[in-house]
Amino acid sequence: MPLRVHHLDCGTMCPACARLMNGRGGWLEPAKLVCHVLLIETPRDGLVLVDTGLGSLDVADPSRLGAAFLALSRPQFDAGRTAVAQVRALGFQPEDVRHIIVTHLDLDHASGLPDFPLAQVHVFEPEFQAAMKPNWRSKARYLPAQWAHSPRWSCHAAGGGERWFGFEGLRPLPGLQDDILLVPLIGHTLGHCGVAVRDDAGWMLHAGDAYFYHGQLAEQPHMPAGLRLFERLVETDRRLRERNRDRLRELALSHAGEVRVFCAHDPVELAGMRG
C-alpha cells in the first residue's frame, strides 16, 4: 500500500514587499511565504509529519518567537493552520502522529513539536548538537522552549547510508526504510536535511531551506533580490549551501520525471504539489 501524502501550510508569513520577496506584486504589498509541512499516512506506522510549522503554543503567545522573527517574517497567527488543528480536521488525533522528521530545528520548523508530545522526533545528529549547544550566532534561530517537553529524540548520524540519486540517503524509520529517507543538505544550518518520500506517483524531496525560490532550480536560475539577501543572512555555510543548491538544481532538471523537488517556504511550489 503506497504512502498517502498531504501538503499543508502550517504558517503563512507576510514579510514586507512582495516584489522583492515573491518576484511579483507591488512594492508596498505584503509578500507571502508558507511553511510547507507533509502529513504522511502510512500502512503500519501511523502518521508521519515532515516539519511542523508554527505550533499552537507560539500561535497563542507569539512573543515566544522573539521580536526579530516577528518583525521580519510578520506571520499570520491562525490556530486553524497549525499542524495539530489540520491533523484533527483530517479526522485524526494528535496521538496518531507517531513520528516527526525535521529538516532542521529552526523555530519556524520545530514550533509544533509540543503539540505532539508522544511522537518520536527524528533529526540529523549534527543539527541536534547545533541546536542543543548553539553558538552566539545560532542562538536566535533555535528556541529551546519548543523542546522543553523533552521530546523522544532519535538522532541519525552520517555514514552507513545509501546513494539516492547521487545524494546520501539515511533511513530514519525501519518500517518505512524503502519509502522515507533523510538526505543531508548542509549549509543553511550545520545539520540541515531534506526528506525524500515515495508515494504512488514516485519520489518527492522536501528540501527544507536548502533553497527558497522555485526559480533557483530553473534552467536559467533566478531569484528575487530581497529573498536572496534573506537567504544569505540566515545561512551557516555559504559554500556548502550553494553546492547543495546546485546539486538540487541538477537533480530537478535531470530527473524531472522521477523526483519532485520543493522547498519549505515557496507558495508556488506548495500550490503545485497540491495540484
Would you name each region that the model predicts?
Residues 3, 12-85, 195-208:
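Conserved beta-strand hairpin/beta-sheet module of binuclear metal-dependent hydrolase folds
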Residues 52-55, 105, 127, 187-189, ...:
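Active-site metal-binding loops of divalent metal-dependent hydrolases
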Residues 75-108, 120, 125-184, 233-258:
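Metallo-beta-lactamase
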Residues 110-120:
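Conserved nucleotide-sugar donor-interacting segment of glycosyltransferase catalytic cores
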Residues 14, 56-58, 129, 212-214, ...:
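Feature marks short, surface-exposed loop/turn motifs that line or immediately flank catalytic pockets
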Residues 7, 37-42, 48, 158-200:
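Core dinuclear metal-dependent hydrolase active-site scaffold
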Residues 71-85, 201-275:
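Cap/insert and terminal regions of metallo-dependent hydrolase folds
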